[in-house]
C-alpha cells in the first residue's frame, strides 16, 4: 500500500487498528522523554497528519480524525490540515472537548484505545483511563507508528555526548547528585528515575546534539543513595566524557536496556517518577517491580535548574552581550541591503543572523528555528519560512524576527519587530500597546508570594484596556546551555510557581491579527531581590538582553512618563554595554538607535 499522502497513511493506520483490535488510536506529540522539541525519528504526528507543531494530540477513529492544537497554532494548523478529513480542535476554546472526552465518546463498552507507551506520558494515560473507565473501555499499548512508518524515517539520533565543564556549569555532576539526593530525602524518597532530557542534562552536565536546536543526549538516569546509572548508547560517549562520568561515580549502561534493567532491580527503593514526564512504558515496569515503591511528584530538578546559580548567571550575561552584538550587526546589514534596493526574503534574514552568531567561537547551535515573518505572516506565532513558501520583504510594514542561539556559556531568545517603511495607524497603535505591555512587565515589582499567573496579568493589562489579548503565555523560562523553553516557571494564566531570584524568564507580549500583522517584543529578564521591609520581600526584574527597540513606530502620548523613562534608561544601558564591542561606524549607528525619546 502506498503511504505518500495523509489520506493513504490514515487508511493504513485504520487497517492496522482493525488488525490489532483497537477502535481508536492516539498519537501524541512526544518522544520517550516528554521533549518539547523532538528528534526527527519521533515526529510521527506530523507524518500521519501533516501538522508541524508542539503541544498537540492526534486521534483517529474508524470514521474520523481530530487534531488538538493550542492558540499559538490555530492559523498554522488550519492551513496544514486543509484538504484532509482532519478536524481541528482548538484547545481551550468554548465547546471544544478534551482529548480524553473525545476518546471516551468515540468508544463503546468493551472497546480499546491504542497508543504507544514509550511516547505517551503516564499522566496522559492516567487521565485517559479515568475517562474510559466510565464507558467500560480500556487502553491497549502497541506501537503502530513503528509498524507503519518504515520508509524514509530518520534514524534515532546518535551524536557525540560530552560534558559541559564545571567552569560553566558551576557544579560537578557528583555535587549535583548530592544536592538531588538531599532533595529526595526531604520528599520521602530514596531514588529517582530521570527521563526528561533537560533535567538529565543539567544534573550530569551532559550535552549532545540529538535534537535540532537543542544540545541534549537521548538518555535516562536512575539515581539511588549509592548509585547513578546513565542509560545511553555508550559508543557515542566521548572518551573524555566517559572518564568524567566515571570520576563522578556514574555508571554507564545501554539505552535500550533501561526497561530490562529497571525490571531486574532488587534493591528496595521508594522511587520518585513524575507522571507528567516519565513515559508509560517505564512507569509500568517500575510499578510492576515488587522491590520498588513508586511515588508521583514534581521533579525537584525542575526548581534546582530553574534557579540559575551564580556561575550560570555570570556566563549567561556574557553570552547575551555577544548575542546582542550579533543582533546589532544583523540589523545594520539588513537596513543597508534594503536601502540599496536588494531583494531580500524571510529566508535571507535567517542567513544573515546565522552568519553573525556562528562567527562566535562559543556558538553551538541556534536555540530554535528562526521565525522571520513579514507582514501578515507574523500573525502566525510560530511561522517558519521555507524555500517553497516565503515572503519578499517590502519597504513598508513590519518584519518580526524571533531568534536565539545556544553558546557554551548560555542560551538566548529575543524578538524584535522592525519597521521597514511606512506604517498604518493600526500598526503603530498595536506596536505602541505591545511595547507598553513589555515595559510594564519589565519594570514590575511584586511581593514574593505572588504566583506567575498573577505576574502574567501585568503584561496583559495594557492590551486588555483595548479589548485585545494574545493566545499564548507572556513568558517562559530559558535553560542554561539547553532548551529555549523549560520549567518550572512560566508567565501564563495557569502557572502557580512563585518567581525566585535567579530565575530567567522571557517578556514577550504581542498583538496578532490574522493575515494582517503580528507584533512581538521580547527580552529575557532575570528575577532579582528588590527589598525586605515590614510588608514582606519584594522582587523585580532586570534585563539580560540589550538590543535596541525600535522607537519610530511609537505613537506620541500613549506611553506614560515612567514607561518613557524605562525605555530611555534601557537604551542607555544598551549603548554602554555594546559600544565597547563595536567599531566606530557601528557605534554611530547604535547611538542613533538608542537616542532618548520625549513625551
Range-by-range predicted roles:
Residues 1-599:
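Active-site neighborhoods and metal-handling regions in enzymes and metal-associated proteins
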Amino acid at each position: 500500500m502506498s503511504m505518500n499522502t495523509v489520506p493513504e497513511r490514515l487508511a493504513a493506520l485504520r487497517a492496522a487498528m482493525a488488525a490489532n483490535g483497537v477502535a481508536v488510536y492516539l498519537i501524541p506529540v512526544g518522544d520517550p522523554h516528554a521533549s518539547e522539541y523532538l528528534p526527527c525519528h519521533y515526529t510521527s504526528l506530523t507524518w500521519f497528519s501533516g501538522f508541524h507543531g508542539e503541544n498537540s494530540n492526534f486521534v483517529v477513529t474508524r470514521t474520523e480524525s481530530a487534531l488538538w492544537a493550542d492558540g499559538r497554532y490555530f492559523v498554522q494548523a488550519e492551513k496544514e490540515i486543509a484538504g484532509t478529513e482532519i478536524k481541528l480542535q482548538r484547545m481551550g476554546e468554548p465547546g471544544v472537548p478534551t482529548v480524553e472526552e473525545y476518546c471516551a465518546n468515540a468508544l463503546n463498552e468493551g472497546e480499546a484505545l491504542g497508543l504507544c507507551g514509550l511516547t505517551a506520558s503516564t499522566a496522559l494515560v492516567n487521565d485517559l483511563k479515568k475517562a474510559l473507565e466510565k464507558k467500560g473501555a480500556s487502553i491497549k499499548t502497541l506501537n503502530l507508528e513503528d509498524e507503519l512508518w518504515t520508509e524514509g524515517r530518520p534514524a534515532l539520533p546518535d551524536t557525540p555526548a560530552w560534558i559541559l565543564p564545571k567552569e560553566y556549569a558551576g557544579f560537578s555532576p557528583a555535587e549535583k547528585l548530592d544536592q538531588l539526593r538531599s532533595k529526595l530525602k526531604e520528599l520521602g524518597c530514596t531514588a529517582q528515575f530521570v527521563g526528561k532530557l533537560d533535567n538529565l542534562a543539567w544534573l550530569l552536565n551532559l550535552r549532545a546534539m540529538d535534537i535540532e536546536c537543542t544540545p541534549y543526549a537521548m538518555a535516562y538516569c536512575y539515581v539511588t543513595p549509592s548509585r547513578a546509572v546513565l542509560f545511553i548508547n555508550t559508543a557515542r560517549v566521548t572518551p573524555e566524557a566517559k572518564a568524567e562520568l566515571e570520576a563522578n561515580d556514574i555508571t554507564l549502561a545501554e539505552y535500550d536496556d533501561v526497561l530490562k534493567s529497571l525490571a531486574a532491580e532488587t534493591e528496595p527503593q521508594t522511587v520518585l517518577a513524575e507522571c507528567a514526564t516519565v513515559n508509560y512504558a517505564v512507569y509500568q515496569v517500575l510499578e510492576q517491580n515488587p522491590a520498588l515503591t513508586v511515588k508521583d511528584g514534581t521533579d525537584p530538578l525542575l526548581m534546582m535548574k530553574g534557579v540559575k546559580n551564580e556561575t550560570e548567571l555570570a556566563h549567561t550575561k556574557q553570552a547575551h552581550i555577544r548575542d546582542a552584538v550579533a543582533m546589532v550587526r544583523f540589523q545594520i546589514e539588513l537596513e543597508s541591503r534594503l536601502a540599496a534596493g536588494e531583494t531580500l526574503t524571510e529566508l535571507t534574514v535567517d542567513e544573515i543572523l546565522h552568519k553573525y552568531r556562528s562567527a562566535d567561537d562559543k556558538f553551538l547551535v541556534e536555540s530554535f528555528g528562526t521565525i522571520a515573518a513579514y507582514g501578515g505572516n507574523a500573525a502566525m506565532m510560530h511561522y517558519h519560512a521555507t524555500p517553497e513558501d516565503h515572503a519578499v520583504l517590502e519597504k513598508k510594514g513590519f518584519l518580526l524576527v524571533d531568534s536565539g542561539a545556544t553558546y557554551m556559556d548560555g542560551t538566548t531568545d529575543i524578538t524584535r519587530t522592525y519597521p521597514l517603511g511606512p506604517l498604518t495607524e493600526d500598526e503603530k497603535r498595536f506596536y505602541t500597546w505591545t511595547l507598553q505591555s513589555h515595559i510594564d512587565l519589565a519594570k514590575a515589582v511584586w511581593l514574593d508570594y505572588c504566583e506567575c499567573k498573577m505576574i502574567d496579568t501585568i503584561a496583559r493589562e495594557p492590551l486588555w484596556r483595548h479589548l485585545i489579548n494574545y493566545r499564548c503565555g507572556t513568558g517562559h523560562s530559558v535553560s542554561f546551555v539547553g532548551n529555549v523553553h523549560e520549567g518550572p516557571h512560566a508567565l501564563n494564566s495557569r502557572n502557580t510557581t512563585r518567581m525566585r531570584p535567579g530565575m530567567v524568564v522571557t517578556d514577550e507580549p504581542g498583538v496578532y491579527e490574522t493575515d494582517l500583522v503580528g507584533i512581538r517584543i521580547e527580552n529575557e529578564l532575570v528575577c532579582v531581590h528588590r527589598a525586605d521591609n515590614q510588608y514582606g520581600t519584594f522582587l523585580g526584574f532586570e534585563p539580560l538582553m540589550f538590543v535596541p527597540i525600535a522607537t519610530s513606530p511609537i505613537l506620541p502620548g500613549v506611553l506614560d512618563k515612567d514607561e518613557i523613562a524605562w525605555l530611555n534608561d534601557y537604551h542607555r544601558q544598551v549603548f554602554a554595554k555594546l559600544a565597547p564591542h563595536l567599531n566606530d561606524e557601528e557605534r554611530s549607528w547604535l547611538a542613533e538607535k538608542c537616542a532618548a525619546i520625549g513625551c
